[in-house]
Every structure is written in C-alpha cells, then in structure tokens.
C-alpha cells in the first residue's frame, strides 16, 4: 500500500474471503488492520491508516478449503438488479451484445459462444495488458486472455437477464499451455460465475480453460483448482486481488504464494466485547453508549444477537443483533 498524499489517509486491501465454494482461515495479518469489513459482493476488505508519503507492506497468511459444489445463497430483488447492470467492462447495453444475448439466452449457450468464438492469445501474458472489455473483444476475437473470456460472459449473461459477476484469484495448474494463467505478474486467473435461480446458488464456470484444453468440461463440472481472491459484481474494476497491489519498482515481483495440501484446520469464531459509556450522566436523560464486538479469530463470525443487561436501569435487558463479522473485523452496537 502507498500514500502519495501530504496528509494521512485510510486505504484498504482485499484479503481472500469465504464464498459459496470455499471456507477461509486467516492465520495472521501483519500489521493488524484497524478494521475489516464485508462489501456487497462478500469480499473482506482490511482497512489501514497511512501517514503522509508512507509505504506499507501487508503480509497475510492463511488457508482455505475449496469445494466443487456450491452452497446455496438467496439473492434479494435489489441484488439481482445490481448483477444485471451494465459496467465499464461489462457493457451489457452494447447493441451487438444485446443482439447476441437475445439469440443465446441461457448460461450454457453463452458459455459455448464465448468458448467457441474467442481465441486465447498467449503472447499477451508477457505484456502489460490493456483490458479490452466485452465490447472490445468482440472487435478482436483472436486476441483474448482470461479477462476478456470472463468479461464477455458476464456482459452477455447480464444482457440476457442472468445475474453474473467475475472472480479473480489463483488457479492451480501444472500445464500452463492448456490451463493458462494471465492476470497480473503474479500469474493469477479470472473466471465468471452466474446465478442459477433454481439451484439458488452462484455457479462458477471457466470458459478460458475449456477453450485452451480443447474441450474439457468446465461448465457442468467444476474442480478443486480454483481459489477466489476477490469477486467483482457491483464494480467491474474493484476490488483489486492480492498480487495486484503494486507500487513503482515492484511491478515484476511475485507477491502471492500458494501451496496445495489435504490438511485444513477448521477454527471456531472467537468474539470479544468492550464498552464505551460515559462515567456520568444527567438524571432524566437517556443513557446511551457503545458496545464494540470484535472478531479476534481468523474465521468468519455468523450473524447473532448479544444480550445487554442492567441491574438498576430500564430496560433491564436488551437484545442487540449484529451481522456477520469477518476475521479481525468489528461491529459497533448502540445501547440505550
């Protein structure tokens, strides 16, 4: 992270998070963030306060258990509408994309179109990539990398009325020609997912690898080789995944290291509470204060309720609800 300003600033970095295909344990974050929050796409974003002209390296260590079968997730009407919107690189309102979407009109047909009509360009992996976006790659179908395969799928799906978004992260491959990686110098990967209303789940697919492997099915059967770092749904450009946080002079460095193992130690969430009440109050006026719930563990803490009791005050018992808290995050509750 870098603050080029002459004044302090708050900035943030995305860390790998739980989603319907993976469970994440964060063993350590150094230095510890001032807070971690969950954005609209479920990403965990760690916040840092940087002094003027300060650079800060953040080291995150952890593990993840990856599944090939997604967990269910119900979307609200507002969420579905969000995942149908046109974005900078997902130009769902583009006339050509709208025409194709009307003809294809299903996730599988859209997937097949992307696989069969784009050509993977391995020469672009070594270059500083200019992201073409969905509309751009339709003008040059012979020069696509994983970003364009993903962008075109997302744009076509959204234009067809199918909620869709992109995933960026690590994909385990032993054959870079058949299963290439082409996102950032850390050689990450990008793939799309669409929402299946019948299954009530986000379904990940990989048109890039189906194209480059010559037909291995990455639509009906997913694998254990994809580990998401970030999900982009509300914004086609943000957040940036681990490996994408580069400052001048570090663009060729490798910041992400992943090893595959069968060992995964599941942890239970651990919460702590502190209070912020005034030491004195005026008689007849309501007593208000804050209760800070902190997640001191490395795993996601689920929604729950905390009971607040008082011996000589009314009400004598209050139940305060709070939403999920990510590792090293906190919630501030108001009690009165």
Please state what every model-predicted region is:
Residues 283-290, 303, 318, 331:
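Short, solvent-exposed loop/turn segments enriched in Ser/Thr/Gly
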Residues 174-272:
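Active-site rim recognition segments
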Residues 103-108, 112-190, 195, 213-224:
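Active-site neighborhood of thiol-dependent amide/isopeptide-bond enzymes
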Residues 1-68:
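Intrinsically disordered, low-complexity N-terminal segments that are enriched in acidic
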Residues 38-42, 50-141:
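Acidic low-complexity segments
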Residues 1-5, 292-298:
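Asparagine-centered strand-capping/turn motif at beta-strand->loop junctions
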């Amino acid at each position: 992270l870098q603050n080029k300003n002459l004044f302090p600033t708050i900035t943030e970095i995305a860390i790998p998070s739980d989603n319907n295909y993976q469970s994440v344990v964060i063993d350590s974050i150094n230095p510890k963030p001032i807070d971690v929050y969950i954005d609209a796409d479920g990403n965990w974003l760690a916040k840092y306060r940087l002094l003027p002209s300060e650079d800060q390296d953040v080291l995150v260590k952890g593990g993840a258990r990856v599944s090939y079968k997604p967990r269910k997730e119900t979307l609200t009407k507002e969420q579905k509408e969000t995942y149908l919107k046109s974005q900078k690189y997902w130009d769902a309102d583009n006339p050509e994309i709208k025409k194709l979407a009307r003809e294809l009109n299903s996730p599988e047909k859209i997937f097949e179109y992307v696989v069969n009509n784009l050509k993977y360009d391995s020469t672009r992996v070594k270059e500083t990539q200019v992201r073409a976006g969905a509309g751009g790659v339709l003008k040059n179908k012979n020069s696509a990398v994983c970003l364009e395969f993903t962008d075109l799928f997302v744009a076509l799906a959204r234009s067809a009325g199918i909620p869709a978004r992109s995933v960026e992260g690590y994909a385990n491959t032993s054959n870079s020609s058949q299963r290439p990686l082409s996102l950032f110098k850390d050689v990450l990967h990008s793939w799309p997912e669409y929402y299946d209303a019948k299954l009530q789940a986000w379904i990940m697919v990989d048109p890039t690898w189906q194209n480059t492997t010559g037909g291995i099915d990455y639509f009906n059967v997913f694998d254990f080789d994809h580990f998401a770092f970030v999900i982009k749904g509300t914004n086609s450009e943000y957040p940036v995944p681990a490996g994408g946080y580069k400052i001048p002079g570090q663009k060729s460095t490798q910041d992400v290291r992943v090893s595959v193992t069968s060992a995964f130690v599941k942890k239970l969430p651990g919460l702590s509470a502190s209070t912020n009440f005034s030491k004195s109050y005026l008689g007849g006026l309501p007593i208000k204060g804050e209760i800070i719930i902190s997640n001191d563990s490395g795993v996601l803490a689920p929604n729950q309720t905390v009971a607040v009791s008082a011996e000589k005050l009314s009400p004598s018992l209050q139940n305060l609800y709070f939403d999920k808290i990510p590792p090293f995050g906190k919630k501030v509750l108001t009690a009165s």
